[in-house]
């Protein structure tokens, strides 16, 4: 039973981490729908490691080529690379806000923000934000010509994804589009920005909830991570291809309906 449960968590986490619909919200709501225990923020953060590994694997050529073109990873030329500077700048807001949340919200897993009502309202609000982002014009910014302030704004939007229902990819892609980014590069930067933010979330949860992790069965958890990895690869490939030519419309409609259905079932 543990294996099936963790495979279930892995599939939901992997698909919804990168498709802009909120992985945390779907883990909670779909778990309730199928009568499976809500994994909570700690387990959710740990199985997200599979998603981080998927980003590395999918963009391995881009990452390694960038590293090779800027000498070795510990040399100054590496840190002068624009994309790595942008990722660093974009990660600062979630580190600050995430740290504040950890300090002052002692039981975030059971807070109002993880309630079904909050998830529903946030999902509906995000559908409106994504709609505005999708219809915005002048998409001329890309990974090569973007400004560091663009990275900061996208990073600030990512910090709000701490709230279940926001969606890290939904928030970052929307902010990028509103800032004038090209659709494909908006999604690509969102995924690359997820490497440090998701990794840090998993690390912090591990350190602060180490006693809780000792209760998780190792083999089912490992299977869950593998499942997350492969489902994340599918989601990344799908979203990059879909968004570049179709935009966010299907996800906007889905999020609106998702939020309304939750409210109707409260």
UniProtKB/Swiss-Prot annotation:
Location comes to: Cell inner membrane
Q: Which domain of life is it from?
A: Bacteria
Which Pfam families does this entry report, sorted A to Z? BacA
Catalysis: reaction(s)? di-trans,octa-cis-undecaprenyl diphosphate + H2O = di-trans,octa-cis-undecaprenyl phosphate + phosphate + H(+)
Q: What is this protein called?
A: Undecaprenyl-diphosphatase
Q: What is the lineage of its organism?
A: Bacteria, Bacillati, Cyanobacteriota, Cyanophyceae, Synechococcales
Question: Where does the UniProt entry say this protein principally localizes?
Answer: membrane
Q: Which HAMAP family does the UniProt record give?
A: Undec_diphosphatase
Family to which this protein belongs: Belongs to the UppP family.
Any one Gene Ontology MF annotation carried by this entry is:
undecaprenyl-diphosphatase activity
Enzyme Commission code(s) on record: 3.6.1.27
According to its UniProt entry, one GO biological process term is: regulation of cell shape
The keyword Mitochondrion appears for this protein: no
Does the keyword field hold Cell wall biogenesis/degradation? yes
- Miscellaneous comment text of the record: Bacitracin is thought to be involved in the inhibition of peptidoglycan synthesis by sequestering undecaprenyl diphosphate, thereby reducing the pool of lipid carrier available.
Where are the membrane-spanning stretches?
1-21, 39-59, 86-106, 117-137, 153-173, 190-210, 216-236, 246-266
Q: What does this protein do?
A: Catalyzes the dephosphorylation of undecaprenyl diphosphate (UPP). Confers resistance to bacitracin.
Q: Which UniProt keywords apply?
A: Antibiotic resistance, Cell inner membrane, Cell membrane, Cell shape, Cell wall biogenesis/degradation, Hydrolase, Membrane, Peptidoglycan synthesis, Transmembrane, Transmembrane helix
Q: How does it sit in the membrane?
A: Multi-pass membrane protein
């Amino acid at each position: 039973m543990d294996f099936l449960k963790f495979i279930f968590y892995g599939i939901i986490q992997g698909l919804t981490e990168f498709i802009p619909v909120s992985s945390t919200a779907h883990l909670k709501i779909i778990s309730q729908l199928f009568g499976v225990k809500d994994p909570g923020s700690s387990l959710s953060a740990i199985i997200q490691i599979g998603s981080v590994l998927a980003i590395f694997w999918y963009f391995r050529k881009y990452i390694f080529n960038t590293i090779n073109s800027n000498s070795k990873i510990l040399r100054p030329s590496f840190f002068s690379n624009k994309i790595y500077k942008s990722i660093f700048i974009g990660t600062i807001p979630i580190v600050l806000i995430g740290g504040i949340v950890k300090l002052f919200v002692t039981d975030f897993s059971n807070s109002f923000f993880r309630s079904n009502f909050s998830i529903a309202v946030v999902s509906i609000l995000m559908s409106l934000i994504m709609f505005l982002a999708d219809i915005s014009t002048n998409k001329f910014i890309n990974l090569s010509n973007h400004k560091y302030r663009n990275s900061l704004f996208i990073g600030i939007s990512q910090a709000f994804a701490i709230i279940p229902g926001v969606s890290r990819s939904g928030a970052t892609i929307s902010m990028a589009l509103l800032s004038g980014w090209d659709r494909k590069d908006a999604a690509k930067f969102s995924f690359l920005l997820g490497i440090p933010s998701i990794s840090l979330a998993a690390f912090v949860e591990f350190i602060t909830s180490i006693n809780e992790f000792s209760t998780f069965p190792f083999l089912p958890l490992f299977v869950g991570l593998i499942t997350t990895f492969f489902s994340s690869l599918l989601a990344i490939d799908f979203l990059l291809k879909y968004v570049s030519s179709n935009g966010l419309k299907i996800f906007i409609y889905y999020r609106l309906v998702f939020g309304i259905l939750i409210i109707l079932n409260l």
